[in-house]
Amino acid sequence: MTMTLSPEHNGPALGAVLTDDGCTFALVAPRAERVELALVRDDGTTIRNVDMTNDNGTWRAAVRGVVAGQRYGYRVHGEWNPDAGLRANPAKLLVDPYARAVTAGVDYTGPIFDHTAESYYEPDTRDSAQSVPLSVVVADSPAPEPIARRLPLEQCVVYETHVKGFTIMHPSVPEHLRGRYAGLAYPAVIEHLTELGVNAIELLPIHQFVSEPFIMGRGLSNYWGYNTLAYFAPHGAYCSVGTEGDQVQEFKNMVSALHRAGIEVILDVVYNHTCEGSHEGPTLSFRGIDHKGYYRLTDDLRNDYDVTGCGNSVDTGHEEVLDLIHESLRYWVTQMGVDGFRFDLATTLIRDSAHGVDQNHEFKKRLAADPVFDGIKLIAEPWDMGPYGYQVGRWGRGWSEWNDRYRGYMRDYWRSMAHGVNELASRVAGSPDIFDNDERPPSSTINFIDAHDGFCLRDLVSYDGKHNEANGEDNRDGSDDNRSWNCGAEGETDDPGVNALRHRQVRNMLAGLIMSDGTPMFCAGDEMGRTQQGNNNAYCQDNQINWVHWDLLDQWADVFATAKRFIALRRSSPLLQADDYHYRTEVTDADGKGLGRYEMAWMNGYSGEMGEADWNDGGRRLLGKYVSNATDEAFLIWFYSGDQPVEVTTPPVPWGTGYRIVASTADEGELPTEALGPQADFTLPGRTVVAMRVTVPTTRAQVDELEGITTAPADAAQDGPAEQPQQDATAEQTPERTAGSAQDAPAPQ
């Protein structure tokens, strides 16, 4: 099956499309005066130049005898006037924006810049063909096997990983497959994922990318991949057998293998900027084809207007850019089999001008109207660096968003730097204060505590400050707002007490994340103590700083077991994957009679439901999240970040008749193993997450009978909280009242 264009465009597909007797080529270049197709050898020398025909701004050529594997590029002739945003320079061989495979490598010592070293206004006339990546003609092949059933996001546990870093050190993967698409598809790797329980992987960028010259000048390379060159081409360096188009089939094989295991594939995509950097950067593709069309420019048209921090910003106000992004996304769904996308710096894609943001932008309208994207996961990183760039909570139905407020608060909570538990209630209930608008469900929030950008979980509990010296910028790069705590020693230590606490804190963060409403996401290796040695900006470290060390799995087996247990618990019950906000909805029996409990409630640990004094207690560290349905299922999840043990009392009837701990982050022997009754006391150790399965009455008659037998002590409400730690001197000021505030009824309840 060949690519097809959006309904807005008629005619043959863009890019290179093989035919019975050769290949057709098509390039959109509305400002070009002439375009040459260059068929080239592996070394960049020219086999043949073909003048293309202008078809209303789309340049076309049909060439007999071309076969799969042929390398090619374009030379675009036109006006050179940098002051007007016009940068045509036919000396520069350009990558096809629709190329489905691209050769690797850029020679930054070669003539790859469209201007001379002496003057930005003077065109460089040297041929770049032997210094730049080349487009490759690719034969069509069947799409990967579809997954048996795409799950709604609330049923997904998302695992952010890197194709190379995840398997490059895996001892069971054959050496020639490590760090490749085939390595990620290897049985031992998939077995790890399925045993852990994750059912969706989010791959750091796999579109063909190149390293920036300033990184390479330091002897490093772009590891993350947020520097895209070609939006249809899988990154060739991740292929085990070559870059003559083989990467396309190997990627498809990987998707098929993951799908057979019930694992969805989500791509992190970077449509907000390209690898060409600022107006002084290299000319590899878009700049030479139509600089003024692809990029946002300053008002005087002389410079790129950058809202991404990467030198340029794509301009989705132009049809050619929207077409490219739309068709690229369709291709990855229909031909490459992916199940979703995470859009890097997504706000850039919905700017109506350099200074404005439009949540009804044509970009979003196109995806909403295209049936190809029905059931496809669309996840926004809902910010960029421009004016009004922070758009968290504003993307509307059909979109989910990375929730940085969850990340920041939960880091503070687990280091006992949060003020009370009001915000905790909102964050673990799906952040209704942010996302309960436009009829959006809790799955709209992608909850995470760590991601590729910043400290990984182990480093969050091992370092108070960043240690980015290896990046070559004197530790100036990377955020200083880490909200981390080293547990008593900076970096690696032999202190058994510090190490035990670090293990426990990682267990807590993973368990709390998985027990929160919304969609959980964590980083590959968190479950086995992966460390970046304190580097919180390891974008340029293609080495053991980033790679997953599989030999840590035994040492951190407790963390793996805890994550596995909580993931299994979450996936076992619809209650723990709920996708609606339960604003104090009473549970009823089959006859419609109220059972005296609610679908969600908040417990204080001594008398039952949280009261006004509990919500106003800035030193409170304990909160119980109670969820129930109309049948016989309920859970009570205790979150406790205090450092000392606390006596906790289970809630009275009608909340439950029995409480059994089914998962916890505590050490063996710290918690009761037997089932507890209502109003039963037990000791909750410091810094713990505990999940209890609750036995509940299912009829009003049962409630009445049980309440007659098990009556709460009359003075229970006057006893006060069992857990009242002193407010941390460094705790932040009282946050805005969230859905958990007593004055507006603790919600979601």
Identify the residue ranges that each predicted region occupies.
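Carbohydrate-interacting/catalytic domains
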Residues: 1-159, 164, 493, 498-503, ...
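Conserved, mostly hydrophobic/aromatic
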Residues: 27, 74, 161, 203, ...
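Short acidic/polar active-site loop segments enriched in Thr and Asp
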Residues: 33, 199-201, 339, 519-520
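Short, polar loop/linker segments at the starts of domains and inter-domain junctions
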Residues: 48, 170-187, 463-468, 669-680
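Core domains of carbohydrate- and sulfate-ester-processing enzymes
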Residues: 76-143, 212-227, 261, 281-305, ...
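Hydrophobic faces of well-ordered beta-strands that scaffold small-molecule active sites
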Residues: 157-159, 201, 265-267, 341, ...
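Substrate-binding/active-site clefts of carbohydrate-active enzymes
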Residues: 162-338, 345-369, 434
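Conserved alpha/beta catalytic core and glycan-binding cleft of carbohydrate-active enzymes
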Residues: 350-353, 358-524, 529, 537-541, ...
